[in-house]
């Protein structure tokens, strides 16, 4: 069975989902039947073809009237502001990938369902009353056929949750802190300009900028036992893609740095293959651009202090890795729903 997908919002994640679908060779499993985006279709086609972070798309892209063509595949283009007015029923949409970054409540999900979609997957953290929040590779096996409105969490949650799980299962985490070193994003300014967050009034290319983050809440959503025992801070840095996460945890069992690295390396080669990767090469952030893994552990940066404090550095392409997980979760939702 081929899953019929519609994309709502054709920004960074929406476009990368389409590119990842074609580059990964999964078109027999997923077909994009429609894209809803307020921007004009010519601009959509141009930005799909030419991307500053990920280069030229290898597939031919063209726009004709209300259709976007990728190769010979025709995708209907919509410019609808009202979720209730979207023609998902007419198009036979199985799963809507809502990549707007704006919608994330159950009410918004129900609007897609009312328009005729069978399932909804948000590309960002949603409200607590959604049917499920998935970090693929960790808890997708908990998806049920009755789960209609699902969140794929965030890029940073997808990056750090697998590593936390591995360390907790092996050594028993007592508490932890996370620092996200994230590339600049569209909600920042090119030059100094007004913004409700005064730090985000400043030019993104000229400063390291502290930003509020809800990553600690995202961690405790998956690990309730860590409530009030994990804290997170975030900074944005003057790069356009790839994120690093500095994770520090105190653990119950004594451990050495080489043992931590061996654990994570074996996981990357085994149970978490394709989700977690491991490297000891002297790499920098740009080397992880276009990497499809959720997390890449940098073994050269692992430290252990006093046998119970572990520090690790984990990289991710916050666009490409997450876009690939959107496809994985879509297929997981369809598998349990339509088998």
UniProtKB/Swiss-Prot annotation:
Q: Which CDD domains match?
A: GAPDH_C_E4PDH (cd23937), GAPDH_N_E4PDH (cd17892)
One GO-annotated biological process of the protein = pyridoxine biosynthetic process
Q: What is its EC number?
A: 1.2.1.72
Q: Which UniProt keywords apply?
A: Cytoplasm, NAD, Oxidoreductase, Pyridoxine biosynthesis
Name the Gene Ontology molecular function terms of this record: erythrose-4-phosphate dehydrogenase activity; NAD binding
Q: Which residues bind NAD(+)?
A: 12-13, 81, 318
Q: Which Gene3D superfamilies match?
A: Dihydrodipicolinate Reductase, domain 2, NAD(P)-binding Rossmann-like Domain
The active site consists of: 155 (nucleophile)
SMART domains, per database record: Gp_dh_N
**Its annotated pathway?**
Cofactor biosynthesis; pyridoxine 5'-phosphate biosynthesis; pyridoxine 5'-phosphate from D-erythrose 4-phosphate: step 1/5
Q: What is its main location?
A: cytoplasm
Which reaction(s) does the protein catalyse, per the Swiss-Prot or TrEMBL entry?
D-erythrose 4-phosphate + NAD(+) + H2O = 4-phospho-D-erythronate + NADH + 2 H(+)
Pfam families (UniProt xref):
Gp_dh_C, Gp_dh_N
Annotated site residues (Activates thiol group during catalysis) in this chain: 182
For this record, an example GO cellular component is: cytoplasm
Localization, UniProt: Cytoplasm
Q: Which domain of life is it from?
A: Bacteria
The UniProt record gives the binding positions of substrate as 154-156, 200, 213-214, 236
Q: Which NCBIfam families match?
A: E4PD_g-proteo, PRK13535.1
Describe the family membership recorded for this protein in Swiss-Prot or TrEMBL: Belongs to the glyceraldehyde-3-phosphate dehydrogenase family. Epd subfamily.
What is known about its subunit structure?
A: Homotetramer.
What is the stated purpose of this protein?
Answer: Catalyzes the NAD-dependent conversion of D-erythrose 4-phosphate to 4-phosphoerythronate.
Recorded protein name is: D-erythrose-4-phosphate dehydrogenase
**UniProt source species:** Shigella dysenteriae serotype 1 (strain Sd197)
- Identify the taxonomic lineage of the organism of origin: Bacteria, Pseudomonadati, Pseudomonadota, Gammaproteobacteria, Enterobacterales
């Amino acid at each position: 069975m081929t899953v019929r997908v519609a994309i709502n919002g054709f920004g960074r994640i929406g476009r990368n989902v389409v590119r990842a679908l074609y580059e990964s060779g999964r078109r027999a499993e997923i077909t994009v039947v429609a894209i809803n985006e307020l921007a004009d279709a010519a601009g959509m086609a141009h930005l799909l073809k030419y991307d500053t972070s990920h280069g030229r798309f290898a597939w031919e892209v063209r726009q004709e009237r209300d259709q976007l063509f990728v190769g010979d595949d025709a995708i209907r283009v919509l410019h609808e502001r009202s979720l209730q007015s979207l023609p998902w029923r007419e198009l036979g949409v199985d799963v809507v990938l809502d990549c707007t970054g704006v919608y994330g409540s159950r009410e918004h999900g129900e609007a897609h369902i009312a328009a005729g979609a069978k399932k909804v997957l948000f590309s960002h953290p949603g409200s607590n009353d959604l049917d499920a929040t998935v970090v693929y590779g960790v808890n997708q096996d908990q998806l049920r056929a009755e789960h209609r409105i699902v969140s794929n969490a965030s890029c940073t949650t997808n990056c750090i949750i697998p590593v936390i799980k591995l360390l907790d299962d092996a050594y028993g985490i007592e508490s932890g802190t996370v620092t996200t070193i994230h590339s600049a994003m569209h909600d920042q300014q090119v030059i100094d300009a007004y913004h409700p967050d005064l730090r985000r009034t400043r030019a993104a290319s000229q400063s390291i900028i502290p930003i509020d983050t809800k990553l600690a809440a995202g961690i405790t959503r998956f690990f309730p036992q860590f409530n009030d025992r994990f804290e997170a801070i975030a900074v944005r840095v003057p790069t356009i893609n790839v994120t690093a996460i500095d994770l520090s945890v105190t653990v119950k069992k004594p451990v050495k740095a080489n043992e931590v690295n061996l654990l994570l390396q074996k996981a990357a080669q085994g149970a978490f293959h394709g989700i977690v990767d491991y490297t000891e090469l002297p790499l920098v952030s740009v080397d992880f651009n276009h990497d499809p893994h959720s997390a890449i552990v940098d073994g050269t940066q692992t430290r252990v202090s006093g046998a119970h404090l572990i520090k690790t550095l984990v990289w991710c392409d916050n666009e490409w890795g997450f876009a690939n997980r959107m496809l994985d979760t879509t297929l997981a939702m369809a598998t349990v729903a339509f088998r």
